[in-house]
């Protein structure tokens, strides 16, 4: 059997870039909760003892940006300088202006346009991907890397591994078989975890705890064998982390946020953006389309692309590729997709309920992936029924 290796990585919520994603989305949540028509483009950067939020926000909401920054950092676990950032004593800088009136008139007519007439907030192309290799209809390498990161945070916060600190990264290499275009996982080839830790723990203790409390509960035993390679804190020391170790910036983890290197990516980040920004809403609707294609049995694996022009409601193009796994021709799948899904940004916002903030709705997306999550707030993960007739054998 001819197999190949493919690798996906993830970072957990204490990684400096992910910290920034979460702050940007916490700001978005706060704006949308009070004013669903908020126009938000919120960026965050962080370094030692400092967090800055900046961008363009037009909203009727009364938002305390500094309070949001400090709470988000505190909830992650950045409560002292020695873990990478002190949420209550760090400098918080705010540089927020209103959305450009040029963009406002072209996209939403200064809030006068009907939902179906709202134009895309910018040009761009977005991809949605789905594969039948996991129940989530997501790539196994990405699912495992993401879940390992989430587990690291869980055992840190519940005290199972008290030596853990907030920052950490994971990476999983899976051996696959290509079954006529569909991806079939055979085994896990390599597991890599690099996690921030305190001064008291030894490398042997780190390795033992990671295997017992993180890897064992997450990676199914059927994928592990005597040849599986484990790299557990291979650098030997990771005490300095968070924004103290590396500068952080919103939007630098776009592959981790999506499909772990599978499918494709148009380059636009998600966090801190309201649904008129098609980088986010466009990517969400094509994930729903791709997932629905696979869940309804039209294909075992597929990718869907959509593209936009600023100020124009209708997409410029929609594309479907089933990698040869389709039960009907791709052009017929495309026809079904176009008949079922409304790709206009204003309608995406309504159909996926993307103007609703609060309850950490978007903050939840900003760590451990935007796709493949079992959560009612992830409305784009709901499979839509697709009408098609299976060809006669």
Swiss-Prot record:
Its main location: cytoplasm. ATP binds at residues 15, 167-169, 235-238, 246, 252-253, 269, 273, 277. Binds 2 divalent ions per subunit. The metal ions interact primarily with the substrate. Can utilize magnesium, manganese or cobalt (in vitro). Binds 1 potassium ion per subunit. The potassium ion interacts primarily with the substrate. Keywords: ATP-binding, Cobalt, Cytoplasm, Magnesium, Metal-binding, Nucleotide-binding, One-carbon metabolism, Potassium, Transferase. K(+) binds at residue 43. GO terms for molecular function: ATP binding; metal ion binding; methionine adenosyltransferase activity. Mg(2+) binds at residue 9. One of its GO terms (cellular component) is cytoplasm. It comes from the Eukaryota. Pathway: Amino-acid biosynthesis; S-adenosyl-L-methionine biosynthesis; S-adenosyl-L-methionine from L-methionine: step 1/1. GO terms for biological process: one-carbon metabolic process; S-adenosylmethionine biosynthetic process. Belongs to the AdoMet synthase family. This is S-adenosylmethionine synthase 2. It comes from Daucus carota (Wild carrot). The gene is SAMS2.
